[in-house]
Amino acid sequence: MKILFCDVLLLSLLSSVFSSCPRDCLTCQEKLHPAPDSFNLKTCILQCEEKVFPRPLWTVCTKVMASGSGQLSPADPELVSAALYQPKASEMQHLKRMPRVRSLVQVRDAEPGADAEPGADAEPGADDAEEVEQKQLQKRFGGFTGARKSARKLANQKRFSEFMRQYLVLSMQSSQRRRTLHQNGNV
């Protein structure tokens, strides 16, 4: 069992060493000299192997590799800085939670070769269904909070009116006692 595990480990290491994507990404990283946090080697390798879409980082690397000089032209730093920014996983999770962004991501994933606006090819019926769903959620949520708010307001009014009634009754009783005591001459 140990021999089999060692063989698999050795083969995986050899395949990663002899593949061109890691070597190309390392070369690209050396030629670009980016900030340590801006260049993600794993992302570059995945983009090279075409497992991740879109591939802005790998596009810049192919241009650098094709130039061969290792120096970028003065117009390229903007392209490099835009390509080196990769959204974090937490940012992507937050974006995917939003329904509109999720639909745009799904459209983009469905048509990887399309450069047109992502929402332009979507079916109009899908947007209508999504809007109806959002309105229903808004109505339900708004109605729920509205009902609680009005119920709370009514309960506060009832509580206050009950308090006022008790206060008035007690004050009337005490004033009657005073009058009675005053009339009897006990005061």
From Swiss-Prot:
Residue ranges of Sequence repeats: 109-114, 115-120, 121-126
Subcellular location: Secreted
Location of region: 3 X 6 AA tandem repeats of D-A-E-P-G-A: 109-126
PROSITE patterns to which the protein is assigned, alphabetical: OPIOIDS_PRECURSOR
UniProt-annotated stretches for the region Disordered: 109-133
PTM comment: Specific enzymatic cleavages at paired basic residues probably yield other active peptides besides nociceptin.
Tissue and organ expression note: Brain and spinal cord. Low levels in kidney and spleen.
GO molecular function: opioid peptide activity; receptor ligand activity
Signal peptide per UniProt: 1-19
Propeptide: 20-95, 180-187
PANTHER family: PREPRONOCICEPTIN (PTHR11438:SF2), PROENKEPHALIN (PTHR11438)
Family statement: Belongs to the opioid neuropeptide precursor family.
Protein name (record): Prepronociceptin
Native species: Mus musculus (Mouse)
UniProt gene name: Pnoc
